């Protein structure tokens, strides 16, 4: 698998891969991590991620070690003035004795801050891609690519610039067996037989501007329950509990409350077992794509869909074009016009996906048999 790599990259054995964003961003590093392992057999990969993003590491079997860090250049103004904190990061990286660093960023981020930290830590090979000039901070700089390129492809273009071969460009994760067992126990404790069909609803996102109204999600999920006869497993973080008001009342006895009951590996196991997932453009969207589970994605106008949408799973991506998109905002001042999507449209999208999979046909057949 190993080909002719630029410079000393072919001899690199201790690699630092930097992705300092959210869970979904880290999930999308999978194809790069896999390609690095395939091209450099026996290499050791440390993932430098944010504390939140590091939660995805158990799903990425190519990661040998995880370093979780809140860095100043990704901060939203919440970190105190503390230069010693950044110097501690440099010293931590220095102790890692890394041969090379691969710095992954989105189209609007710079790799140069991370590159400078790696330079100060004595990492000789430092790869990144940027539109702006960064002096000698990076030892290897990939040419800029179009903004609209999908993030997975953007990541892969970076290492392909150095001659790394990429055999598989698809997103994938590995669900730990322990997480599958825990997910099964959670379902069974709520009267859902493990292995039986269910819908999964993950109705929230970390940003208000990316959250489809919960009452509409509840109405859509309720209708899909009526059509399929399946329960709706509702997932979310512990912080989402305060947002459940009215949701389970609307779902009735078909709603299965797992909000705040799972970590990310267990959420992935629940996504893996679902017949259909309803979600926003958040980490659950990337999980369903990696696991090839059909999903209806309510995609807000905060981002360009070409950069983030599922590429492998069967899906329906619903959004309304608006003059203000993409806004990259956390809070929407315009009443979420990009989410002006009635629940009926969500239901129609879900039923069309189930029909493609033959699920509705199977249910109708069972109903006919019961009437006979």
What positions do the PLM features span?
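Catalytic machinery of carbohydrate-active enzymes
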Residues: 1-372
């Amino acid at each position: 698998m190993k080909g002719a790599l630029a410079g000393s990259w072919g001899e690199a054995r201790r690699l630092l891969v930097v992705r300092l964003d959210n869970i979904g961003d880290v999930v999308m590093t999978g194809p790069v991590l896999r390609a690095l392992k395939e091209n450099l057999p026996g290499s050791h990969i440390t993932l430098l991620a944010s504390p939140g993003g590091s939660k995805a590491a158990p799903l990425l079997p190519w990661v040998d070690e995880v370093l979780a860090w809140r860095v100043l250049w990704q901060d939203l103004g919440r970190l105190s003035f503390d230069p010693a904190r950044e110097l501690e990061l440099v010293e931590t990286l220095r102790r890692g004795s890394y041969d090379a660093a691969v710095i992954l960023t989105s189209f609007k981020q710079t790799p140069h801050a991370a590159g400078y930290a790696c330079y100060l830590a004595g990492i000789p090979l430092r790869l990144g891609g940027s539109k702006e000039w960064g002096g000698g901070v990076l030892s290897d700089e990939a040419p800029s690519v179009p903004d609209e390129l999908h993030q997975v492809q953007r990541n892969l273009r970076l290492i392909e610039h150095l001659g790394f071969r990429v055999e598989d460009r698809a997103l994938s994760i590995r669900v730990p067996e322990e997480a599958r067992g825990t997910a099964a126990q959670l379902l069974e404790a709520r009267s859902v037989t493990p292995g039986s069909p269910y819908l999964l609803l993950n109705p929230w996102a970390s940003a208000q501007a990316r959250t489809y109204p919960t009452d509409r999600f509840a109405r859509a999920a309720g209708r899909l329950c009526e059509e399929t006869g399946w329960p709706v497993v509702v997932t979310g973080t512990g912080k989402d509990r305060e947002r459940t008001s009215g949701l389970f009342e609307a779902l009735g006895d078909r709603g299965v409350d797992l909000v705040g009951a799972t970590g990310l590996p267990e959420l992935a196991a629940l996504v893996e077992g679902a017949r259909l997932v309803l979600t926003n453009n958040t980490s659950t969207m990337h999980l369903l794509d990696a696991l090839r589970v059909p999903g209806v994605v309510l995609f807000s106008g905060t981002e360009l869909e070409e950069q983030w949408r599922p590429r492998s799973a069967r899906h329906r991506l619903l959004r309304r074009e608006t003059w203000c998109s993409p806004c990259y905002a956390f809070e929407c001042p315009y009443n979420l016009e990009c989410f002006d999507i009635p629940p009926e449209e969500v239901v129609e999208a879900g039923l069309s996906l189930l029909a493609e999979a033959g699920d509705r046909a199977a249910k109708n057949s069972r109903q006919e048999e019961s009437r006979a």
